């Protein structure tokens, strides 16, 4: 697997794109971290308990200790996404071109539903609308075989059952300005759902852009938003819309920066500008950004830098959406090698602090950080050994 295809394309986003899975301010005593791993065939997704008072994961002599049994996925599970109420979950299985569905057992572990749902070629990212009516799946395709990527849309039924909507998968339609007359074969990498309105945004690594679509709330059908194609930096690899603001951020792995946008009421994007100028705001970030996530209130944004082996933190201006990097000595922290995904979980107390987790694909470890909410300070806890080649990660 290439470095690019080895990076998580979601986040889950989210309901999101690098996928935001937090229980907000819940004081529940039961909390879990879920980790999808690619080191076996088929892959697995495993639950681990979180001690919310300490941020520690269930472990023994530095090795994660699972809750219950690991559930099997398809081959090479990448994105891992829960529904908003955390009653079922999905993995995008890049190697077997399908989606696995899971329900949650009483002990917090996952149980795989019978059968899998066929996706397009090489599904790499997942996102869901806030009402959990639709699952959006980015299929990478294979440009080397002249097979461009696209987006599959599934309606979500009882127990998380999936049914593909009419006319799915939907093409990216990259034949209009501002791209060249003959653009490169699209290579979509990530997807995010807007916090307001029925819009999704898909990054295209090959053409250096993000594409906007509206989705029909009844049928799930996709249509281009006005303008549709918005140029960003080199090799966009992650896209994220915070859960408490109508902003969009695109992290570019080739130029190591973040493009910042306001989502308009029609789904089109307007570049956020630096203070007192008309210059589009572009935030510098770590080497090879692969995933993004924020807290529930969208006070902070965190970026996993895959090649820089670190997490980089930013404050989000609640009015303008402008990102400001937190001081390096408190807001940037080292991870294990090759972080590909992020998860965040409230510590359940009244102080509002959080625990932040990274899935480190290169090191086969999980990193944990305490997030001091008043300052954005990240304090590392000991890394723990994980199953081989961990990928998607989520917390509940």
Region locations from a protein language model:
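Bacterial N-terminal signal peptides that target proteins for export
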Residues: 1-11
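Bacterial N-terminal signal peptides
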Residues: 10-22
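Predominantly soluble domains enriched in secretory-pathway, periplasmic, or organellar proteins
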Residues: 23-396
